[in-house]
């Protein structure tokens, strides 16, 4: 028989069992729903409620909302949800108005791929998955305000996702004001002449297409032809953040190639400095802040112009402008748009054969090399390959400080995604440039004095000398000399010279690239954009939102051979001609016109960029969010100067994806005056992972963990020895344990306790089903201390508890309260267990005052049993909004403490004393102790060191 179905239970009909837990939990979940127990009142609007509750200090607690996958939840998924629920319950009991709810992030590739696999429409499968997950989550007893729940696929929700896109599209970043402004204000500047157009023509003289192109250079959301990450195996393009370090798609592990396609982008780079600087005011783990700082990648240097006779100039960004005199060639990324403008019709006379790649003309060489480079990922291109590849463009540029002509190459180790996509090559002092120069027999010049004994002739070197701790040499022209200067001073001098001569200036560069925002998928938010017959993009008016997804016969993305870098994407929406081609009156005075809809969709990150705002005012169909409601829950306040959610819990894997994107959207909305909070999440907490053992047979295939037997330290499945490693939990690994199984066997409260007791919340830990019973027994003992298992009657008495019990109780109250506030739930459970064990050991019926406070202590952790016991103790109201117990300091302090007395560093006595004893009193007691007197043996005392109440150290004469 199992632990939950023993003969003993038959003899004790009112014992706390799995069956009783199921009954209790179902009843109280129904009660909470019926009573709206977890409904948090807004200060105004349709969700306003109890003014007394709304007047309390507020707490907005959020989880990263789940994808509704077809597999449902395993026990690892609810770890964070249970933790935030425990924390939220404690905050309610300590006088806060707590907003805690949960929605679903239901658009995007995961849901679409599941739908494709099962042959059902994404909406049908996604909604079915959500219903299943709602049942699973409700079973856990999570205290969510369900009035505020939604899914990102709800048209009422993505109407506002589209609306936000239009705000971003219709905005530009004013670098002088350091904020976003409406694009109409920029147009006004062009119209009145306070801002000149690039070619000096008046705004009215520009064609509609020219105006659109010019504004596109400023808009915070814009479409452009640019190199993107194209995954033929997925049939879509990917953001940089969705590509793994080895150049493959994060989802599906397909090869990713560079392809030049027209795509929508978000100008997140305009906010790079603010995204970086505002991290300092956030209460986030330092590891996450570091990841964002590195991803944004701020570096100081200079922009330098290298003139090209036939095409203006090539601009480079360098952090080592001090080495300009050593630049002997240049390299452009193969995709650089300057390449076409500089290549001559024929190779210049005397071109080195190794530079041409064996091609008859520069154009042929460039075309062939570009095709070769396109088949590589960025990671492959930047790998330290033994053989450096590239080709001469046939063009020369002029080094602006030396006046020398330097050849211009293209090579795949230079990327368009950093700096300007062009570099000045200083081979004597850069490892990659050194290797390239050796491969192509290019000249090198030493301009930094080596600190070793290699000399100053790079032709004799085995590698580059790249130290910063050295002086400049060979770095002078008729106007400036850097010789003898250190790197820092040389940088400052040459930067000043470049600016004076109009060939460069000091600048800051960022690793961060603009956010690729379009996907060739069906299951995403449609763009509220249409194109006229001239190809000019027009925003839909707000009255036409939401633009809903149309029905299509085939919603699968068209995928290709994963290795086919030449394949071109095809969007599912483009197959619905009736939806794509429309006649609309956009209200711009042009009347009804024919338009073509944008057929890309938004990425799965779009809906999660602003969902915290929708939780605040979920039924508002007039505006994004009521300003007074947003100010109440998320506005700036003392200690939170940029506002935001009070606590946001989720995985660390979203450091440079969701978290960065959401910060960007918040800043745009803040700049435009729509919200008061400049940051979405003030405090971030990353929970650890619940791991599980994975068992694999000799072929490396996972076998069901539940069917594995252990014999003499080895593991067997169906008689075959298998290996065991600790890893993730999941359906594909055949080691998933569902919360449904544990709830059926022990109850939801036991599952909650076990997950919180496994270890510190931010540390990963292995799941062990066999250990769950420990928390089940805790609840059984706690129940038994309040309820008679034979009769079901409450056994408490109205008497005062003894001194020992009061001390145990108040120490537990003090410790549990601190642990709850600090999210140290494992140690809180340990303290509750210690108190319950004390009460069990003491025997006899509990004092009512002790029993009630014991129930209140366990209530945030195990709310169902707490509600049941609270009701049985005679209370008609819910335990949820009761005050959390407050410890009496008099009982928290120990009655006596042990003081160690040392003589010459050796312990000679231990004294039981009051913790309030003074140094003088303690010294007198120690010197009078018989053991101390005997140990001194009549010797005099040179010194007594007292550290009351724990230590006395005696130094004999």
UniProtKB/Swiss-Prot annotation:
Keywords: Aminoacyl-tRNA synthetase, ATP-binding, Cytoplasm, Ligase, Nucleotide-binding, Protein biosynthesis
Region forming the signal peptide: none
Motif ('KMSKS' region): 728-732
Span(s) of short sequence motif 'HIGH' region: 66-77
Primary location recorded for the protein, binned into one broad class: cytoplasm
Gene Ontology process terms (BP): leucyl-tRNA aminoacylation
Keyword Membrane carried by entry: no
CDD domains: Anticodon_Ia_Leu_BEm
Residues the record lists as binding ATP: 731
Molecular functions per Gene Ontology: aminoacyl-tRNA deacylase activity; ATP binding; leucine-tRNA ligase activity
GO cellular component: cytosol
Catalyzed chemical reaction(s): tRNA(Leu) + L-leucine + ATP = L-leucyl-tRNA(Leu) + AMP + diphosphate
Pfam families on file: Anticodon_1, tRNA-synt_1_2, tRNA-synt_1g
Uppermost EC category: ligase
Compartments it resides in: Cytoplasm
InterPro entries: aa-tRNA-synth_I_CS (IPR001412), Leu-tRNA-ligase (IPR002302), Leu_tRNA-synth_edit (IPR025709), M/V/L/I-tRNA-synth_anticd-bd (IPR013155), Methionyl/Leucyl_tRNA_Synth (IPR015413), Rossmann-like_a/b/a_fold (IPR014729), tRNAsynth_Ia_anticodon-bd (IPR009080), Val/Leu/Ile-tRNA-synth_edit (IPR009008)
Domain of life, source organism: Bacteria
Gene3D superfamilies membership: HUPs, Isoleucyl-tRNA Synthetase, Domain 1
UniProt record similarity statement: Belongs to the class-I aminoacyl-tRNA synthetase family.
Matches recorded under PANTHER family: LEUCINE--TRNA LIGASE, MITOCHONDRIAL, LEUCYL-TRNA SYNTHETASE
Name listed for the protein in its UniProt record: Leucine--tRNA ligase
Organism: Streptomyces griseus subsp. griseus (strain JCM 4626 / CBS 651.72 / NBRC 13350 / KCC S-0626 / ISP 5235)
């Amino acid at each position: 028989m199992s632990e939950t179905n023993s003969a003993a239970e038959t003899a004790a009909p009112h014992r706390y069992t799995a069956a009783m837990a199921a009954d209790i939990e179902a009843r109280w979940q129904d009660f909470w729903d019926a009573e709206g127990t977890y409904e948090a009142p807004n200060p105004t609007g349709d969700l306003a409620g109890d003014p007394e509750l709304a007047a309390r200090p507020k707490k907005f607690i959020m989880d990263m909302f789940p994808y509704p996958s077809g597999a449902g939840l395993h026990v690892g998924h609810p770890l964070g949800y249970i933790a935030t629920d425990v924390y939220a319950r404690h905050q309610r009991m300590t006088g806060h108005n707590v907003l805690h709810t949960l929605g679903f992030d239901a658009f995007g590739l995961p849901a679409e791929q599941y739908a494709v696999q099962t042959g059902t429409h994404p909406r049908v499968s996604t909604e079915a998955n959500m219903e299943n997950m709602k049942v699973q989550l409700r079973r856990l007893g999570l205290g969510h305000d369900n009035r505020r729940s939604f899914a990102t696929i709800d048209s009422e929700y993505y109407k506002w996702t589209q609306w936000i896109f239009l705000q971003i599209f219709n905005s530009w970043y004013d670098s002088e004001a350091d904020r976003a402004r409406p694009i109409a204000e920029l147009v006004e500047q062009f119209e009145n002449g306070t801002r000149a157009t690039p070619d000096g023509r008046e705004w009215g003289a520009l064609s509609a297409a020219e105006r659109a192109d010019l504004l596109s250079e400023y808009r915070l959301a814009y479409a452009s032809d640019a190199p993107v990450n194209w995954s033929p195996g997925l049939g879509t393009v990917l953001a940089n953040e969705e590509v793994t370090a080895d150049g493959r798609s994060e989802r599906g592990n397909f090869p990713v190639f560079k392809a030049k396609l027209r795509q929508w982008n978000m100008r997140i780079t305009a906010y790079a400095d603010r995204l970086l600087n505002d991290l300092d005011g956030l209460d986030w783990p330092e590891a996450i802040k570091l990841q964002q700082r590195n991803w944004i990648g701020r570096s100081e240097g200079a922009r330098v112009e290298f003139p090209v006779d036939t095409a203006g100039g090539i601009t480079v960004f360098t952090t080592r402008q001090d080495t300009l005199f050593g630049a002997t060639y240049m390299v452009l990324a193969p995709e650089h748009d300057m390449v076409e403008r500089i290549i001559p019709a024929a190779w210049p006379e005397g071109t080195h054969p190794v530079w041409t790649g064996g091609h008859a003309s520069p154009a042929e060489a460039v075309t062939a090399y570009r095709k070769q480079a396109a088949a590589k990922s960025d990671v492959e291109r930047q790998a330290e390959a033994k053989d450096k590849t590239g080709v001469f463009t046939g063009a020369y540029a002029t080094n602006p400080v030396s006046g020398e002509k330097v050849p211009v190459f293209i090579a795949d180790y230079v990327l368009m995604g950093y700096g300007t996509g062009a570099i000045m090559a200083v081979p004597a002092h850069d490892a990659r440039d050194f290797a390239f120069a050796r491969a192509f027999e290019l000249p090198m010049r030493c301009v930094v004095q080596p600190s070793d004994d290699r000399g100053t002739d790079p032709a004799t070197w085995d590698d580059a000398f790249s130290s910063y701790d050295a002086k400049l040499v060979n770095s002078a022209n008729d106007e400036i000399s850097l010789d003898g200067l250190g790197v820092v001073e040389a940088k400052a001098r040459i930067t000043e010279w470049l600016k004076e001569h109009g060939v460069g200036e000091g600048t800051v560069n960022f690793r961060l690239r603009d956010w690729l925002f379009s996907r060739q998928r069906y299951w995403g938010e449609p763009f509220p954009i249409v194109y006229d017959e001239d190809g000019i993009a027009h925003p839909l008016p707000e009255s036409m939102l939401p633009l809903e997804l149309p029905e299509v016969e085939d919603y699968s993305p068209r995928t290709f051979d994963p290795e086919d870098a030449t394949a071109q994407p095809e969007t599912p929406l483009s197959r619905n001609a009736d939806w794509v081609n429309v006649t609309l009156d956009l209200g711009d005075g042009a009347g009804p016109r024919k338009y073509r809809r944008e057929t890309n969709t938004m990425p799965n990150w779009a809906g999660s960029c602003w969902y915290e705002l929708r939780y605040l005012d979920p039924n508002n169909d007039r505006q994004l969010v009521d300003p007074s409601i947003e100010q109440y829950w998320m506005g700036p306040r003392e200690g939170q100067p940029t506002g935001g959610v009070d606590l946001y819990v989720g995985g660390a894997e979203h450091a440079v994806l969701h978290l960065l994107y959401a910060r960007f959207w918040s800043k745009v909305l803040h700049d435009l005056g729509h919200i008061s909070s400049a940051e979405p999440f003030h405090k971030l907490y990353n929970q650890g992972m619940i791991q599980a053992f994975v068992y694999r047979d000799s072929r490396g295939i996972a076998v069901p963990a539940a069917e594995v037997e252990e014999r003499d330290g080895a593991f067997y499945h169906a008689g075959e020895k298998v290996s065991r490693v600790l890893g993730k939990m999941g359906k594909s690994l055949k080691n998933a344990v569902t919360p449904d199984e544990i709830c059926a066997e022990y109850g939801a409260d036991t599952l909650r306790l076990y997950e919180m007791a496994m270890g510190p919340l931010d540390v990963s830990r292995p799941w062990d089903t066999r250990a769950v019973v420990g928390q089940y027994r805790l609840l059984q003992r706690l129940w038994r201390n309040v309820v008679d298992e034979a009769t079901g009657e409450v056994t408490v008495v109205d008497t005062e508890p003894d001194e020992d019990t009061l001390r145990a109780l108040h120490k537990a109250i003090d410790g549990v309260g601190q642990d709850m506030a600090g999210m140290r739930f494992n140690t809180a459970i340990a303290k509750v267990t210690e108190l319950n064990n004390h009460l069990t050991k003491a025997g006899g019926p509990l004092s009512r005052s002790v029993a009630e406070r014991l129930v209140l202590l366990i209530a945030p952790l195990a709310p169902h049993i707490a509600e049941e016991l609270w009701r049985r103790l005679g209370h008609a109201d819910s335990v949820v909004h009761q005050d959390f117990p407050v410890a009496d300091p008099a009982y928290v302090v120990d009655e006596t403490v042990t003081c160690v007395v040392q003589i010459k560093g050796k312990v000679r006595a231990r004294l039981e004393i009051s913790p309030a004893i003074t140094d003088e009193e303690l010294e007198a007691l120690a010197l009078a102790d018989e053991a101390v007197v005997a140990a001194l043996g009549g010797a005099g005392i040179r010194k007594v060191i007292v550290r009351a109440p724990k230590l006395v150290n005696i130094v004999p004469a």
